Amino acid sequence: MGKDNASYLQAFILVGSSDRPGLEKILFAVILIFCILTLVGNTAIILLLVMDVRLHTPMYFFLGNLSFLDLCFTASIAPQLLWNLGGPEKTITYHGCVAQLYIYMMLGSTECVLLVVMSHDRYVAVCRSLHYMAVMRPHLCLQLVTVAWCCGFLNSFIMCPQTMQLSRCGRRRVDHFLCEMPALIAMSCEETMLVEAIHLCPGGGSPPGAALPHPHLLWRDCSRGAEDEVSSRAKESLPHLLFSPHSGLSLLRNHHLRVPEAGQQLLPRSGEVPDSLLHHRHSQHQPPHLHFEEQGCEGDHEETSGVGERGWGASTRGTL
């Protein structure tokens, strides 16, 4: 840390939209409503997933983790944000800013990896549906979620010190509503291209990773000539396909705009509940191209599905 940052114990000033008090009141009301909806909605999802044994499946296990991430996002951002919008005090302590940056980056990185995991889970559910429950075992799903959280911790552990050690030439005004990495980088008075490139690499790869399986699924259905399946798959893939480019553009935009949109991370995310891709247990409920006689798996389907479902029923009661 440079000598000009020796006064690091001084509080940062979160500028936000403090020059427009009328806008602050509107933002306060809107963000408060979305915070309440986020807290109530995600809490209800988690409780439902825990209490209903029928939802102890891989897809809903990942969904429960995503809901928990949303709750953590809201808890780490909303209190300070609402405090700044609702009162004259616009400051945040140095240590509070570091903690907010670390938690924000950790949760954001974890969510990026988790969305990629959820997308490929849907890929396995469609393309290997007869063996889905055998492939996506509880132990594997728990490992994937653990990897997502570890990636988030690692990325935040690497990037936070690099961001806070940038020379700021005594600047204390953060041109944002919270201590986010692009806003803190914008305060620096030294070259930041390397830090920005490192920041962009982990998040920039997740939108293509999450969107990659869906064009393949649509192309496979088109090649089979199943019009109903193409229409159904398009509806199911649309949330992921819309969310992925939006995430990538948001990463690029944050490096050029000084004041990102207020409460952006507090809005409910699309693509969280791809519930129309549930794995069906009986062949008569499956689309024509997934019938056993066409897959050549008449003998092992019941055994494979039974083992997978028994494994989830016994193993997820303690994890969901």
From Swiss-Prot:
It is found in: Cell membrane. Residues 290-304 have a biased composition (Basic and acidic residues). It comes from the Eukaryota. Keywords: Cell membrane, Disulfide bond, G-protein coupled receptor, Glycoprotein, Membrane, Olfaction, Receptor, Sensory transduction, Transducer, Transmembrane, Transmembrane helix. One of its GO terms (biological process) is detection of chemical stimulus involved in sensory perception of smell. GO terms for molecular function: G protein-coupled receptor activity; olfactory receptor activity. The chain crosses the membrane at residues 30-50, 58-78, 98-118, 140-160. Residues 267-320 are annotated as: Disordered. Disulfide bonds join C97-C179. One of its GO terms (cellular component) is plasma membrane. It holds the Pfam family 7tm_1. Glycans are attached at N5. Signal peptide: none annotated. It is a multi-pass membrane protein. Belongs to the G-protein coupled receptor 1 family. Odorant receptor. This is Putative olfactory receptor 2W5 pseudogene. It comes from Homo sapiens (Human).
